[in-house]
């Protein structure tokens, strides 16, 4: 386990974990200790002596309480030899007993945690655990996780283990600790549903890298590791060329039935399509998604809805997670920031809202936060640098050019510079530290103009106009471009889409969607651009499609269960309770697959 040398450090304060003493009492007793006055105990460590007061040490450590009060120790005894700890660590322990603070650094954290564990000083243990959580990175996550084998740090262990699972692909590329895993440890990691890999190829390649580190002693473990790969989810070409023909696999008799079963599962999947049984077969069972796409509210059946659905991209399924106590809302904005989903502005067929609600997806609770300065229906919302930006919209009387931003720490909205144009039914995103807003309706016409906001200068700048007028547009940053998708040009709902290059200040067309739509949800999940629901010119829709910039093609995804437009989407990554929002992997009873699916001409599945 390696951390950056003493570049990072913290002084841990823990006034509430052990018995509390007033600051004045602590200061007085510490002065007495340093002066050697009224001390009634000497702690001896490897020849070093530390004067102290028994009462003070007892107040922070049950170890010292037991040591000083046990029947076999004379209460008059003054000198105690303490084994198993260095003088440096004992010095920190004693200072903590008097001051309730301790400096924690990358250089001392392991020894300090071990010492605190030995003396049962839970305040320091917790402080060290919090420090190690903050230091987690690709290089040390395995070492920190293994470190918790020796000490009771369940929260740190969970945090480190989930860091490994969530960052597996990147960790394998750079971590020396990965190569030192035992076969059991590697097997336990790659069999987890929570393992965050977009393609199972990455799991197989990780196995090969691990074996290649010590091929003579590890090649026989291929038979243990290969069944943990979801082989039937691989592209057939990769499976045939890279897995079936691999020398380690071919040389293993135990791998032959695994390969045969994988081929059967791939055939069934190709011929019959996905089925519920795929969730119980370890070769076809989708991993849990790292990020969940939420589709929130909207207009359905002639009125606003409170429906919330969660999209599981790894399983291509929607899960209804509607909170019945939540009120209906349409033409609102949604944003995810620091663990919360924010629902901003909107319309309920009676009122235009300036209110903002915050949803905790772990606790599943809603709370009202500070309202905006203006009522904003058809609002454009985005997140940048820990602020939520809300721009334009319609307040029930006029289309707005005003904009404001919300800071969660202060629970306040602050007005920023107004835009150059009134824009309702526009859409916004962020790219390279700037806010982009495109299209919309100014009260007279649908707009093809776009502008960018610089947070440092608090100024809006007009950029190159789009190729089409677009109100009810979807705008999202994807790769190195700003994408403007669909919308209404004043006559028709659009299938067209275009991408803006900030470097060249130009727009280029991309392939058209399968379906025209305006007032839909848009987000990026697993490196795919998703468009969700909307209005097609005749009716609200529930269909979903996604665009892959690598193939420059659109693909059909699973329909929502509810027809709706005027919804808003946001993506929530790294949920501790992601299983509650994903399609169930055990005893699956989720949504039935569609009877008919329209696919891109070049493929019959979502790209992976």
Swiss-Prot record:
The keyword Phosphoprotein applies. Pathway: Protein modification; protein ubiquitination. GO terms for molecular function: ubiquitin-like ligase-substrate adaptor activity. This is Kelch-like protein 10. The keyword ATP-binding does not apply. May be a substrate-specific adapter of a CUL3-based E3 ubiquitin-protein ligase complex which mediates the ubiquitination and subsequent proteasomal degradation of target proteins during spermatogenesis. The modification Phosphoserine is found at residue 501. Residues 39-106 form the BTB domain. Keywords: Cytoplasm, Differentiation, Kelch repeat, Phosphoprotein, Repeat, Spermatogenesis, Ubl conjugation pathway. Kelch repeats lie at residues 292-339, 340-386, 388-433, 434-480, 481-527, 529-574. It is found in: Cytoplasm. InterPro entries: BACK, Beta-prop_ATRN-MKLN-like, BTB-kelch_protein, BTB/POZ_dom, Kelch-typ_b-propeller, Kelch_1, KLHL10_BTB/POZ, SKP1/BTB/POZ_sf. One of its GO terms (cellular component) is cytoplasm. It comes from the Eukaryota.
């Amino acid at each position: 386990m390696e951390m950056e040398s003493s570049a990072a450090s913290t002084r841990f304060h823990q006034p509430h974990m052990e018995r509390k003493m007033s600051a004045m009492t602590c200061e007085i007793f510490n002065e007495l200790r340093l002066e050697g006055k009224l001390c009634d105990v000497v702690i001896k460590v490897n020849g070093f002596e530390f004067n102290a007061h028994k009462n003070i040490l007892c107040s922070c450590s049950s170890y010292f309480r037991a040591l000083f009060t046990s029947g076999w120790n004379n209460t008059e005894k003054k000198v105690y030899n303490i084994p198993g700890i260095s003088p440096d660590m004992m010095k920190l322990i004693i200072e903590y007993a008097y001051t309730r603070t301790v400096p924690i650094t990358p250089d001392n954290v392991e020894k300090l945690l071990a010492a605190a564990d030995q003396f049962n000083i839970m305040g320091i243990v917790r402080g060290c655990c919090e420090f190690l959580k903050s230091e987690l990175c690709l290089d040390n996550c395995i070492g920190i996780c293994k470190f918790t084998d020796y000490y009771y740090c369940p929260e740190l262990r969970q945090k480190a283990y989930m860091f490994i699972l969530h960052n597996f692909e990147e960790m394998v590329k750079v971590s020396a600790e990965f190569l030192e895993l035992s076969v059991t440890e590697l097997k336990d990691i790659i069999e987890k549903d929570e393992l965050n890999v977009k393609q199972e190829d990455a799991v197989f390649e990780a196995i090969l890298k691990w074996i290649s580190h010590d091929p003579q002693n590890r090649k026989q473990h291929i038979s243990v590791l290969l069944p943990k790969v979801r082989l039937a989810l691989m592209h057939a070409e990769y499976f045939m060329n890279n897995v079936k023909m691999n020398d380690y696999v071919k040389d293993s008799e135990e791998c032959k039935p695994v390969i045969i079963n994988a081929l059967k599962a791939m055939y069934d999947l190709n011929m019959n399509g996905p089925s519920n049984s795929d969730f119980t077969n370890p070769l076809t069972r989708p991993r849990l998604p790292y990020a969940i796409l939420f589709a929130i509210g909207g207009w359905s059946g002639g009125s606003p809805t409170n429906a919330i659905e969660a999209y599981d991209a790894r399983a291509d399924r929607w899960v209804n997670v509607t909170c019945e106590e939540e009120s209906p809302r349409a033409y609102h904005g949604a944003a995810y920031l620091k663990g919360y989903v924010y629902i901003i502005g909107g319309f309920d067929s009676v009122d235009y809202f300036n209110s903002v609600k915050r949803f905790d997806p772990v606790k599943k609770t809603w709370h009202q936060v500070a309202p905006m300065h203006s009522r904003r229906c058809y609002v454009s919302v985005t997140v940048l640098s820990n602020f939520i930006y809300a721009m334009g919209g319609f307040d029930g009387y006029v289309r707005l050019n005003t904009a404001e931003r919300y800071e969660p720490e202060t629970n306040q909205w602050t007005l920023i510079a107004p835009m150059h144009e009134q824009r309702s039914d526009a859409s916004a995103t962020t790219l390279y530290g700037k806010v982009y807003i495109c299209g919309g309706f100014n009260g007279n016409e649908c707009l093809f103009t776009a502008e960018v906001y610089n947070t440092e200068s608090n100024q809006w700048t007009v950029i190159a106009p789009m190729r089409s007028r677009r109100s009810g547009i979807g705008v999202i940053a994807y790769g190195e471009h700003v994408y403007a998708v669909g919308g209404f040009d004043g006559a028709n709902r659009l299938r067209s889409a275009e991408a803006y290059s900030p470097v060249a200040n130009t727009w280029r067309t991309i392939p058209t969607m399968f379906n025209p739509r305006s007032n839909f949800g848009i987000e990026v999940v697993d490196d795919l651009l998703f468009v969700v629901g909307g209005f097609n010119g005749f009716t609200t829709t529930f269909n979903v499609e996604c665009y892959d910039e690598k193939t420059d093609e659109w693909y059909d995804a699973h329909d929502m269960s509810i027809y709706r437009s005027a919804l808003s989407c946001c993506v929530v990554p790294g949920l501790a309770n992601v299983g509650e929002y994903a399609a169930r992997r055990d005893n699956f009873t989720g949504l039935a697959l569609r009877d008919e699916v329209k696919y891109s001409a070049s493929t019959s599945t979502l790209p992976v």
